[in-house]
Amino acid sequence: MGENKKVIFSGIQPSGELTIGNYFGAIKNWVKLQDEYDCYYCIVDLHAITVKQEAKDLRRRTLQLIATYIASGIDPEKNTIFIQSHVPAHVQAQWILNCMSYVGELSRMTQFKDKSKKYEDTGIGAGLLNYPVLMAADILIYQADLVPVGKDQTQHIELTRDLAQRFNSTYSETFKIPEGYIPTGGAKIMSLQEPLKKMSKSSDNPNSFILIMDPPEVIKRKIARAVTDNVGVVKYTDDQPGVKNLMNIMSCCTGMSVKDIEDKYEGQGYSKFKEDVADALIQELEPIQNKVNELLKDKAYLQDICKKGAQKASYIANKTVSKMMRKVGFILPEK
């Protein structure tokens, strides 16, 4: 671990193509953290299978996600980049924490309730219920100080803290108590068609989201079709959520403040503004897209990054899990 550096853990599921919401909300912020913190950036493939995945698609998206991390500026020399399933300690720790969790507290999780409604016709898997316990294990085995999360994940961080404190008080001091880290930069990117909802790749309307790998002509089309209003003024206000969302996208791409954007487009209407938002987004994404495509031609390199990352991650995680096993009364295998 980096000397005297605080530890950060975060991850993204390879359960679908990444949107610009994933990029601006998570990955771009992670890049800013890598010099100041000891960062563990994971591809959380175990979380992905709480909902059925096609095996070949899961493998393809996992490699693409690793390539996207690196192409976006996450340096494998400075950070630990690894695949969750390559470190069995995640599942070992989850089982021990699972046995200290209560069904009531897990079933009260907002995300579980929301996803249960979605899958009630096909049957709700136990993985959906236990998902937050695996997330707690992910964080605690690296003795993470901070966890970059969106506001929709703060409930899971609270559960992680509760489980850490429960284990510490039942046995003895084992885990650091992590805190959620909500970055000050960036913005929550909303749906282009329903701007009061978060942008999601699972939307039925493909015009509502932009993928990191969308080509320029698709980005231009989706921004041109983005919902605005009949006010006709580029203003950053909750009364104009569609315009506000496009302003956030432009601000994330260019670094311009929303006040500067308002001033620049005063009296211009939406057509020129939308064209410029699309151009700024294309300029931001094109170098990443090119680098991703280049990296995907060298799968051996990507797998080597993951192998080295898993070795480093396992060294730290196994130390924590050994402590957990000893404290609950397991006989540790002879080395």
UniProtKB/Swiss-Prot annotation:
ATP binds at Q13, P14, S15, G21, N22, G150, K151, D152, I189, K198, M199, S200, K201, S202. Keywords: Aminoacyl-tRNA synthetase, ATP-binding, Cytoplasm, Ligase, Nucleotide-binding, Protein biosynthesis. SUPFAM superfamilies: Nucleotidylyl transferase. It is found in: Cytoplasm. It catalyses: tRNA(Trp) + L-tryptophan + ATP = L-tryptophyl-tRNA(Trp) + AMP + diphosphate + H(+). PROSITE patterns: AA_TRNA_LIGASE_I. Its main location: cytoplasm. InterPro entries: aa-tRNA-synth_I_CS (IPR001412), aa-tRNA-synth_Ic (IPR002305), Rossmann-like_a/b/a_fold (IPR014729), Trp-tRNA-ligase (IPR002306), Trp-tRNA-ligase_bac-type (IPR024109), Trp-tRNA_synthetase (IPR050203). L-tryptophan binds at D138. A motif ('HIGH' region) lies at residues 14-22. Its EC number is 6.1.1.2. Pfam families: tRNA-synt_1b (PF00579). GO terms for cellular component: cytosol. A motif ('KMSKS' region) lies at residues 198-202. One of its GO terms (biological process) is tryptophanyl-tRNA aminoacylation. Gene3D superfamilies: HUPs (3.40.50.620), Tyrosyl-Transfer RNA Synthetase (1.10.240.10). GO terms for molecular function: ATP binding; tryptophan-tRNA ligase activity. Catalyzes the attachment of tryptophan to tRNA(Trp). Belongs to the class-I aminoacyl-tRNA synthetase family. Homodimer. This is Tryptophan--tRNA ligase. The gene is trpS.
